[in-house]
């Protein structure tokens, strides 16, 4: 089940990591899901961390990949620059090890978002919220088995971030994937799924 995060649908006051977590919590409550295997990438990982800290009784395992919550490089300088297609194209490509993963369709989608002033304001609000909402001092409370899958070439949440998550989350294991950036599930789906399936399989034994 992949719930859509309402990145642009919440009012500006609730366009935060906590606001997104409340949305996910309400969805899980509505569906009455328990024994959840929770997985999140980037900001989604941050939301998953806040959720598991608030509702540990509902979660069986946690998988993070390129997660914010400790450190993130945001998108650097003055992102997002509105109306500069080449800039957006380059920034989108930097998310991945292989720039070809940033297809014209994906770049067009990002570019359309950056042309919308309200959406840009909400992206900036979420980025600032993620930086403020550092979870370093709370991660030792997570007792569930945790899988960390990280691209060795991630420049948004670099490998040292994964090492820090590994150090702070007690029952965690870390797998680096070579020649991979910030989105392993998109860049190397076969390897990503293989690591994930092995982890989930070990929990059912």
Predicted regions and their residues:
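Alpha/beta-hydrolase active-site loop signature
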Residues: 5-9, 69, 181-184
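Acidic catalytic loop of the alpha/beta-hydrolase fold
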Residues: 153-157
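Active-site loop/oxyanion-hole signature of alpha/beta-hydrolase fold enzymes
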Residues: 1-39, 194
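Short alpha-helix in the alpha/beta-hydrolase fold that links the catalytic acid
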Residues: 144, 158-165
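Catalytic active-site module of serine/aspartate enzymes centered on a nucleophile-bearing elbow/loop
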Residues: 172-205
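Conserved alpha/beta-hydrolase catalytic His-Asp/Glu region
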Residues: 82-143
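Short beta-strand/loop motif that positions the catalytic acidic residue
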Residues: 142, 148-150
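Flexible "cap/lid" loop of the alpha/beta hydrolase fold
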Residues: 46-54, 58-90
